[in-house]
Amino acid sequence: LAKEGKPVLSVNAAMNELAAQGVTDLKIQSLHIAPAEEYNQLERMVVKNITKNPGVFKTVKVGYPLLVSEKDLDAVVKVVLASLPKDRKPGDAVVLMGHGNDRGPGDLTLAATAAAFHKADPHVWLATVEGSNSFDNVLPKLKASGAKRVWLQPFMIVAGDHANNDLAGPEEDSWASRIKAAGMTPMPNLKG
């Protein structure tokens, strides 16, 4: 929206604007993948606004992130695997890049998601920019897999800076550069 010259309101400002318009029943939907720090910040902002403005809203509900149940996990794994590049050949590996979080339930959720992807397809790994499921842990597994080509795809709602730089950028510490240095061919697919 900001690129189109439209203002992007903070959660607090958006809630105040909706209250000024007479909205009394409010539903806020998270666009986060896992219940991590940014989702927790959203919840805190909503609670802070409600506390400062008691009685303004009759009801306020905050929707959960994408992955909060085993059913969600199964559905996401199925959809993401179906969306992998059609040019992928047998034996090609895939590394999905999640944002991650270095603590709390978000890290655990993404670890479970990584295990579910790998169980569904042994040539698919999920690694995160932050948190315990780092690319450093995945790279030796890629080497051991014998894959010649490694597809790189973001596991993010918006494939922005992390995908363009950390995943597929030309810097020597990008995942693509590290895969190339390990003797494999990186195949970036930058759709989120």
State where each predicted segment sits.
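Active-site-proximal alpha-helix that buttresses catalytic centers in soluble enzyme cores
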Residues: L1-G192
